[in-house]
Amino acid sequence: MFLGLDSHNYPMRTYGDIAFRVYGTPVRHGLNILQSIQLLCNVGVIIIANGQALSQVSKFHLCYAICCLVFALAGFMIGQVRTLQKYGWFANAAIWMNVFIIITSMGVVAHSGPNYIAVGGSAGAALGGLSVTPDANGNFPPIVHSAGLPPSTQGFIGAVDGLMQAVYAYGGAMLFTEFMSEMKRPRDFWKGMICAQGFIYIVYIFYGCFLYGYQGQYTVNPSFQGVSPYAWQTVGNVIGFLSALIAAGLYGNIGIKVLYNNIFTDFLGAPLLSTKKGKIIWAAFVPVYWSAAFIIAAAIPNFFGLTSLVAALCILQFTYTFPPMLFLGYKIRLGAVLEGEGFNPLTGIVTRHDGGIKRILRGYFKHFLMNTWHLIFFLGSLVTAALGAYSAIMSLIIAFRNPQVTAFTCHSPLDST
């Protein structure tokens, strides 16, 4: 779709531009708003993870809400970077930081037990907590594994939440257009994306299976916070802090651009970011954006529940629901074109011989099998999103029944003592 709709005179810059050219302005605004929400929540999720990391490094002596605030304040500074090109070297460094964390985490979990203090953030806790609850003598249940759906006291909620974690980890189509439009050599991005997806898929699958094999239901998300030796916890948390700050800066950069270019500029008449006034507004808006992300993080101190909710409501849509929906409309428009129709670049006039349901059906049946497949894919993705959203909301409701889990709490989600 990008190659078919992009042009030198009318370049594609955002995900919403695809929706605009296929379905019109209302759908474009809807996608831009949802994209802004996702990017804001992504920054919030990263603040939660690093708030947990800082609280773990401080051995839970520092208030959890303050830990989140420290990371948000760091975001005030890194958020002042306006162009994605300046993130290139930092993003590359972040990859190798994460690889280092993966290697060290695997080495540590292979020679030590799970982090029982952090069972509140474990996979077993998301399944009702029965498999990670100690007995009267304080002995924790043995490590167990499940080849199919794991046993749960909450029905299918925990299993669907686990599925949403996979969606959160692998879903990334939302930023495709933004990266393509900002890179001077799009073919390099295309090759880089394929290599990155292959690398991520292989590493994530192996790493996930490895940690689950050694820690079972005690596996924590983020995983490096589930290692038991404090020294290696600190190594992973400090390096993860730096890596996450780069990722949060990237998400915040694109999130602010989407908000500014598609809401402030279109609806409020704000000046372009390339102007002096635009740069001043950017500098002033960055703290506001990060403050909103901090409020989300501190108000919902449940990493597993929030990531599941963001995955179901946002990431799943941009990766699995919207692509077949957009491609279906794109193919219908192409298939409906009759001889003599088209756009005249000299006059700016679009010629069409008919319209309405007749035109839509003609376009649909032109590529019947492909269009039917994308329609089924779209509907299936909607059902999965509904199940994911329901499960995530129920998980958060159950989590907040715990008196220690409150908004803006000082008690770290990883401290189960």
Residue positions per predicted region:
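Central hydrophobic cores of alpha-helical transmembrane segments in multi-pass inner-membrane proteins
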Residues: M1, A72-Q80
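Membrane-interfacial loop- and helix-cap regions that link adjacent transmembrane helices
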Residues: F2-N32, G44-C67, A94, T104-I315, ...
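Cytoplasmic-side transmembrane-helix entry/capping segments in multi-pass membrane proteins
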Residues: L39, F90-W96
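Alpha-helical transmembrane segments and their membrane-interface exit regions
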Residues: G75, N98, I315-F322
